[in-house]
Amino acid sequence: MKAYQQYIRNVDPYVPGEQPHFDQMVKLNTNENPYPPSPNVLQAIAAIPLQEQRLYPDPTAHQLNAAIAKRYGLQEDQVFSGVGSDDVLAMLFLTFFNGTKPILFPDISYAFYPVWAKLFGIPYEAIPLDEQLRIVPEDYYRPNNGIVFPNPNAPTGIALPLDAIRSILEHNPDSIVLVDEAYVDFGAESAVSLLPEFENLIVVQTFSKSRALAGSRIGFCMGAPELIRALNNVKYSFNSYTLNRTAIAAGTAAMEDEDYFQRHLKLVVETREWTKQQLAQLGFQFPDSKSNFLFVTHPDYDMCQLFTYLRSKQIFVRQQKWKPYWLPFGNFCKQNTRLDSKEKI
C-alpha cells in the first residue's frame, strides 16, 4: 500500500448536512435561518461593477473586517475572516494546536473537531459532558495544548455562562482557548467582552446562522493582534484570496444592518420558545436550548424510526451518531407542519 493511501485510510471525514431539493419539504437538518438576509445584501452585491470581477479580491478583506471590528468595538487587527467558520476553525487548529500535549473538546460537540485533529496529527481528548449534557469547566483544568468548545454547544444547545468561560481561561493561561460561537446570537452571552482580559482567547463566529448568509460562506474570529498576525501568516501560506468580492460586499452589508439583524433574531427566538412549548405538550424532552435548534428525545419513540418517518414526509432532520437526535427548526409555518406530523405518529 502506498503511503498516501494509508494516510487517506486514516482520515474520517466530516459528513455535511444533506441539501435535498424538493418543492414541498421542511428542511431542518443544517440550522439555516428561515428568513432571508438583509435587503442591503442584495443592493451591495448589485453595486459591484461587473468589470471588477476580472480582478482578484482584497486578500485582507479590509472592508468586511473593518465592519466587524466596528460592530464589536475592536480594532481591525483583531479580526480575521475566512470562507465560513469551518475554514477559520481549520486554520486555527493548524496554526495553534501543534504541541505534544492533547487539545481538549467535549465528546458530544461539533463533529469537525476530531476530524481536523486527526487530519493534522493533533493529539486530543474528548471530554465527557455531565449527565445533564453540560460542559463542566473543571474538567478542562488539566494539562493541554489548547481548548475548543462551542457556546452554545452543538448539538445540545446548552450555553455556558460567561463566568464559566472566564474560569476555563484563568486555569489555562498558557493555552489558546477557542470559543466557537456559531449560535451565540440566539441567546447565549458572547465571550467577546473577555478579549481585553485574556490574550489567549479567540472567539469564532459565522454569518451562516443568525445573519442568514450560509450560501455566501463567511466566518470570522476575533482575538489579540499577535494571534491574528500568526493566523494571517498561515493563511497566506495556503491561499491569499479566500473571500471573493461578492462575499465581502454581502458580509459587510449584513454586518452593518443592525436593525434588521435584531428584528429577525427576535422572531427566531420567539419561534424557538413556542416550539419548546409545543414539543413538551407532545411529551418530548430536551435541554434548554439557547441556539436555533433543539436536541430532543421521547420516552415512547425510537429516534431512528422517527428520523425515517419524518424523512418519508419530506421533513429533513440531522441523523447523528449520538442519541437523541437534534431537531433544528425553521419558520412558524414549517413548525406547524412538523408538529402535525409528530401528532400523527
Task: Kindly give the residue locations of the regions a language model identified.
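Short beta->alpha connector loops at strand-helix junctions that form conserved
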Residues: 107, 126-130, 205, 320-321
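Conserved PLP-anchoring active-site segment centered on the Schiff-base-forming lysine
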Residues: 95-116
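PLP-dependent enzyme catalytic core of the Aspartate aminotransferase-like
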Residues: 163, 312, 316-345
